[in-house]
Design a protein with these regions (language model features):
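Bacterial N-terminal signal peptides that target proteins for export
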Residues: 1-10
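C-terminal motif of bacterial Sec signal peptides marking the signal peptidase cleavage site
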Residues: 19-22
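Acidic, contiguous N-terminal accessory segments
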Residues: 34-143, 189, 193-199
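Feature activates predominantly on carbohydrate-active enzymes
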Residues: 77, 82-85, 89, 93, ...
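Structured mid-domain segments that build the active-site/substrate or prosthetic-cofactor binding neighborhood
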Residues: 282, 286-296, 304-313, 433-552
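Aromatic-lined carbohydrate-recognition surfaces of secreted/lumenal glycan-active proteins
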Residues: 355-394, 451-461, 489-492
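Substrate-binding cleft/loops of secretory-pathway carbohydrate-active enzymes
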Residues: 380-422, 465-472, 501-507
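Catalytic domains of carbohydrate-active enzymes that cleave complex glycans
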Residues: 512-674
Length: 674
């Protein structure tokens, strides 16, 4: 097959997701994998927090303010959140709340004292709409500008406005959110200076997938994901593919057999399936007529979903996704083997060729006048995962690519890989030698498809009540995504856990949210800030507990090598070989006891004591799970029953959902017999 050389920037038609990502600066001179090979140059232009206090000018003076909030009469959810969060948190800090006025009722003047939220007529009357390039902000980028005596907080959308409010509160009142019920905020502020703001704050990763604790339970703070600036859910982006028509079962993830249900096609069209029968054959055994029939069926499935989920009904769907089954296998037929061998051994090549053909057919269908209500700028996405992780192209040292022409999409077909990197060792630093090959693969996909999506891991998926050290790996990961222009990141970690996440899951959630937004933030600083502000007087003991767990984990990785791929499936807390006796577990219990003692001074403040003791309870579950599973003989019967009772009570009270991936904790709690 003819090979072509291609420069780094090529003429793929990109969707809005891709365009947003292309605003990112690239490159990192400290990282050995970026010798100027297409990553660009590092810039801090996305995060500028210039704010200078004015002399003898005040937002609040002696507990009073002259300022009002200006908003548009045409509001949306995010703008409502922005005004409510500003008023609520500002009021909590100062005792002052703002009156509201609609933008059509006021006109800008240098002496007017307003805080303007979002794009509105007041911003236009100040002339700022002509001075700002909204296209560079993406969906979430925030801008804060002082002009005259007015402050303008806005973005290209009101997501940016909301995040700008959080920046404003951070600068003026030290607001920082750590956990669903824990944030810092200055209190009893009677005098607050006016600032000259010139703030730009644009996320390094444009779209950030929610996970775990970012899905609050009904009793938790529903603003938590917004305060952490992570609100995306790919289920709101992916068209559902229905097994047997709208209203039937559907899948948006590993959904290839929803496109081609076995009951419908396995007997009549066996060539649609792999030789082993557990995946699709994306070449239909190399028979052109069968390939056309297969792509017709897949296109019809997408068209069916587009029709049922019209733009007016479901505007968030941007992507038609076809995901292989979640197993280490691919079709071994002669035709698929030939395609792989002619595309650098990539099992993803047949999928890309298939999706390009499907995308062309769906685009032609959407272009028909009668289908105007269903027309979207649609991505056609696929997994690069497990056996399909290797790209079907090769990047050369000069930044150009060698590839086969048949993987280049037809005009208007937006192909988008979802790179699910099970091939990393998440227990080791991102720049470790063990992760070199996986880094190269991630970089190559990102360079060939600017705006690609990333799915990563880092957890023991058969054991949710234990500790996994993600911090060395994710220290440098998000800057790599930024450099190579990825537009979405999903760090799975313990994605389906709810209520609470033992193993310092609150901390891991915090640092992942922060690094997604600004990848330059130092990991150690984030860790220390979280522990200091969440645990307060118990911080020294909890910091030592965290450090001991990191040391234990490092030994675990070196001795057992269980931080990579399928090796992350181990049941850790139920296996005594990982602990070398009960001594380490007793050390963790002792540190929890020290932490409980440190907060006894707050017992008269019932709410605060309960909050702090709950944070300690969550991590107490780690040694308790090991002790219950492995060391019953080391305890008096009464002490062992008390331990199991406390374990069960904590899990029930906090509504902890899972004991391991896809498995409720309820059966385990019942098995405790207390």
């Amino acid at each position: 097959m003819k090979k072509n050389k291609r420069t780094l920037i090529f003429a793929l038609t990109l969707t809005a997701l891709s365009a947003l990502a292309s605003c990112s600066g690239g490159g990192n001179s400290e990282n050995p994998d970026n010798p100027g090979d297409g990553g660009g140059t590092t810039t801090n232009s996305k995060h500028q927090y210039t704010a200078t206090k004015r002399v003898n000018e005040y937002l609040v003076k002696e507990g009073r303010t002259n300022y009002k909030i200006v908003i548009s009469e045409e509001s949306d959810t995010q703008l409502n959140y922005a005004k409510n969060e500003l008023n609520t948190l500002f009021g909590e800090a100062t005792g002052v709340t703002f009156d509201f006025v609609y933008d059509t009722k006021v006109t800008y003047s240098d002496s007017a004292t307003y805080i303007s939220l979002g794009q509105n007529a007041y911003l236009t009357s100040a002339g700022l709409d002509k001075e700002v390039s909204f296209s560079t902000y993406g969906r979430d980028g925030a801008r804060i500008i002082t002009q005259g005596k007015s402050i303008f907080i806005f973005g290209a959308t009101n997501f940016g406005t909301l995040y700008g409010v959080y920046d404003f509160l951070k600068i003026t009142l030290n607001f920082e959110c750590y956990y669903e019920d824990c944030y810092t905020l200055d209190k009893n502020v009677k005098d607050l200076s006016m600032y000259d703001f010139n703030v730009i704050d644009i996320p390094d990763v444009a779209y950030r997938q929610r996970r775990g604790l970012l899905y609050p339970t009904a009793s938790q703070n529903q603003m938590f994901p917004y305060r952490m600036r992570v609100t995306d859910d790919v289920n709101m982006l992916f068209l559902p593919i229905y097994e047997n028509g709208p209203g039937s079962a559907y899948n948006t993830n590993h959904n290839s057999f929803f496109y081609f249900p076995e009951k419908q096609y396995k007997t009549t069209d066996p060539d649609f399936y792999s030789v082993a029968g557990n995946q699709l054959c994306f070449t239909a055994r190399g028979v052109p007529e069968r390939f056309e029939k297969m792509t017709d069926i897949a296109a019809a499935k997408i068209e069916e979903s587009l029709t049922f989920n019209s733009v007016a009904k479901a505007p968030t769907y941007t992507t038609a996704f076809l995901g292989q089954n979640d197993i280490q296998d691919y079709c071994s037929c002669e035709a698929c083997t030939k395609v792989r061998e002619s595309h650098y051994g990539s099992a993803c090549a047949p999928i890309i060729i298939f999706m390009n053909r499907v995308g062309k057919k769906v685009n032609e269908w959407m272009a028909l006048p009668e289908n105007a209500p269903y027309k979207r700028n649609l991505n056609y996405s696929f997994f690069a995962y497990l056996t399909t992780i290797v790209p079907p192209f090769k990047q050369k040292a000069d930044g150009t690519f060698e590839y086969s022409q048949d993987i280049i999409p037809d005009e208007g077909v937006n192909l988008m890989p979802y790179v699910a990197s099970m091939n990393f060792d998440y227990g080791r630093p991102f720049y470790s030698d063990e992760n070199k090959e996986a880094r190269e693969i991630l970089k190559t996909w990102g360079n060939f498809y600017p705006g690609a999506w990333s799915w990563t891991y880092g957890g023991f998926y058969n054991d949710y009540i234990t500790f996994f050290d993600i911090y060395s790996f994710y220290e440098d990961f998000h800057s790599y995504l930024k450099n190579y222009k990825y537009s979405l990141s999903f760090e799975q970690v313990k994605n389906d856990q709810r209520g609470a996440d033992p193993g310092f899951g609150g901390l891991s959630n915090y640092v992942l949210c922060k690094k997604n937004w600004d990848s330059s933030l130092p990991m150690d600083t984030l860790i220390n800030d979280y522990i200091t502000n969440v645990y307060e007087d118990a911080a020294p003991a909890m910091r030592e507990m965290f450090q001991k767990l990191r040391l234990w984990f490092a030994k675990l990785i070196e001795k057992h090598g269980i931080g990579a791929g399928g090796q992350m499936q181990g049941d850790i807390s139920s296996n005594a070989k990982y602990y070398d006796g009960i001594g380490f577990i007793n050390e963790l219990f002792d540190l929890c006891d020290d932490a409980y003692k440190a907060i006894e001074i707050y017992k008269k403040d019932e709410a605060k004591y309960k909050r702090l003791s709950t944070y300690i309870d969550i991590e107490w579950l780690i040694p308790a799970k090991v002790a219950i599973s492995c060391f019953e003989a080391k305890y008096l019967a009464s002490d062992f029953i008390a331990m199991k009772t406390k374990f069960k009570d904590i899990c029930i009270e906090l509504k902890i959902k899972d004991i391991k991936e896809f498995t409720s904790i309820n059966s385990y709690l019942e098995s405790l017999g207390v």
